[in-house]
């Protein structure tokens, strides 16, 4: 039994597995892609690319809690990789967990200071945190709020039309 388990772990990831899963996913058969991903992960638990793709698929399906589990496990198994932290942050942000998103992005950028997507996402998270702070400042405000209102309007415009 131990020998079989050792051989299973030593088996290389088949490129076909990843390609098949990606093809199913792109064709819109996400449920079948997830089943194939689970099978491949069961056979090769450290298959980072397939685990990452599974997290992306779960995120796209708005199954945020499951996506967070997948990306968190990847950050634990491969703490040097920036992409799992970046994608974890995206899911946290979508879930409204901005402080967790900020922490994940900071870790991604410690791992790769030039990671473009993490830098962009960090800006988005900072902007969302600013909107939260400015909105809270308006609650119960009795003073001149024109400058604060302008900031909020501009920030929301950027959030609505980022590109």
Regions found by a protein language model. Name each.
Residues 127-163:
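Terminal, low-structured helical/coil segments at or just beyond the last alpha-helical repeat
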Residues 43, 77-78, 111, 140-143:
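Structural marker of alpha-solenoid helical repeat scaffolds
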Residues 48-49, 82-83, 116, 145-146:
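Helix-start (N-cap) detector for alpha-helical repeat units in TPR-like alpha-solenoids
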């Amino acid at each position: 039994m131990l020998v079989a388990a050792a051989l299973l772990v030593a088996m290389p990831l088949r490129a076909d597995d990843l390609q098949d899963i990606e093809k199913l996913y792109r064709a819109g058969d996400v449920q079948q892609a997830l089943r194939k991903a689970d099978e491949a992960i069961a056979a090769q638990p450290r298959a980072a690319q397939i685990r990452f793709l599974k997290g992306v698929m779960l995120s796209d399906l708005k199954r945020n809690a499951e996506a967070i589990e997948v990306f968190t496990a990847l950050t634990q198994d491969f703490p040097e990789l920036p992409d799992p932290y970046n994608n974890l942050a995206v899911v946290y942000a979508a879930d409204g967990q901005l402080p967790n998103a900020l922490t994940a992005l900071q870790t991604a950028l410690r791992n790769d200071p030039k990671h473009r997507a993490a830098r962009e996402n960090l800006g988005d998270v900072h902007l969302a945190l600013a909107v939260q702070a400015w909105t809270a400042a308006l609650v119960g405000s009795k003073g001149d709020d024109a400058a604060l209102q302008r900031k909020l309007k501009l920030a929301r415009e950027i959030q609505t039309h980022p590109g």
